[in-house]
Amino acid sequence: MENAKMNSLIAQYPLVEDLVALKETTWFNPGTTSLAEGLPYVGLTEQDVQDAHARLSRFAPYLAKAFPETAAAGGIIESELVAIPAMQKRLEKEYHQPIAGQLLLKKDSHLPISGSIKARGGIYEVLAHAEKLALEAGLLTLEDDYSKLLSPEFKQFFSQYSIAVGSTGNLGLSIGIMSARIGFKVTVHMSADARAWKKAKLRSHGVTVVEYEQDYGVAVEEGRKAAQSDPNCFFIDDENSRTLFLGYSVAGQRLKAQFAQQGRIVNADNPLFVYLPCGVGGGPGGVAFGLKLAFGDHVHCFFAEPTHSPCMLLGVHTGLHDQISVQDIGIDNLTAADGLAVGRASGFVGRAMERLLDGFYTLSDQTMYDMLSWLAQEEGIRLEPSALAGMAGPQRVCASVSYQQMHGFSAEQLRNATHLVWATGGGMVPEEEMNQYLAKGR
């Protein structure tokens, strides 16, 4: 971006100067509305989420047999919700900032099949596509026991079709593993920041991995191009997919059920704050949408991004969405948080969700490494760097009087609050790689 343009952008949005300087930045969104006002802009409804929920239930018997690690849960891919009181104390001590309320962790990092939040959206979209093909071919009815999809005749049928996706790692992992298991031919287009072990794992499942020297945006574009030349190839579009988004959104009702099981209350007197790491935006956008449908105006969602990849904060704050990239303002999009290394946000998610998100913040790679090692020390839970992005949120919220006033929170409401950090990945990181991460924390 030329200097004059840049200067006028900064004059209009002074916060951009802090982003360019790679400062850890927090922006509380002044444009939030009630769910009732914001919902029409999403273009999806509660019924769409219910349909996704029903589809996953139809596939549960199949998943229970195809992936024995899901059998105990009846073929439902869901993660634990745990309190992390020792980490809460450690954060308070390190940052000299009390966290009012209780700190919880949602362990999507340990979801079965692919060990990340992408096991929600990625697997769901592959299943939805497989169902559509089988229904159209007259091989399946909605009333069938879907475990019949494991038969050789279905493997043969699906082998005529292929799936392609562009990914920094975790989405490719979930789509690759699921597609290969069903019988699709699958190609994952991986960006330069994708971890070697993720590529190796995909190849071990018979997935074709195409590697690029460039970033996520290029991998997605190339994947899209390659798929266009083949009528039997289905491209899963992380930047624009409504189906992926709905796969993530099912998490809202599931979390509501987990809260009920644990006797946790969410209402006006007991607000819920949720902190979601954000790459291109599909995962956190879908989850936040589901949470809003489940808890209404009593849940407050925040997106967390690396200082080197603040694409969603930049897009929503300036209102330019996918018309601007972090590279346009001179930021390199290089971060240890490989799952979040995205320079241009999803225009669909930004426009759909901007009224339903309370804020956005950035944190440095070093902050993620520090919190990664504290969590391992205090709670014995090991995550990948990206997954710690949400962990910086509770201090930002508890330290901001202006945010609390904007929403009229009393001291008592904050004392009764629940702070939920969404841990997005790390359950499958190899030991030696994890030890390197741990060594980088202070």
Swiss-Prot record:
Its cofactor is pyridoxal 5'-phosphate. GO terms for molecular function: D-serine ammonia-lyase activity; hydro-lyase activity; pyridoxal phosphate binding. It holds the Pfam family PALP. It comes from the Bacteria. The keyword Lyase applies. Coiled coil: none annotated. The modification N6-(pyridoxal phosphate)lysine is found at K118. Its EC number is 4.3.1.18. It catalyses: D-serine = pyruvate + NH4(+). GO terms for biological process: D-serine catabolic process; isoleucine biosynthetic process. It is an enzyme of class 4 (lyase). Transmembrane segments: none annotated. Gene3D superfamilies: 3.40.50.1100. Keywords: Lyase, Pyridoxal phosphate. PROSITE patterns: DEHYDRATASE_SER_THR (PS00165). Monomer. Belongs to the serine/threonine dehydratase family. DsdA subfamily. HAMAP family: D_Ser_dehydrat (MF_01030). PANTHER family: D-SERINE DEHYDRATASE, THREONINE DEHYDRATASE, MITOCHONDRIAL-RELATED. This is D-serine dehydratase. It comes from Escherichia coli O1:K1 / APEC. The gene is dsdA.
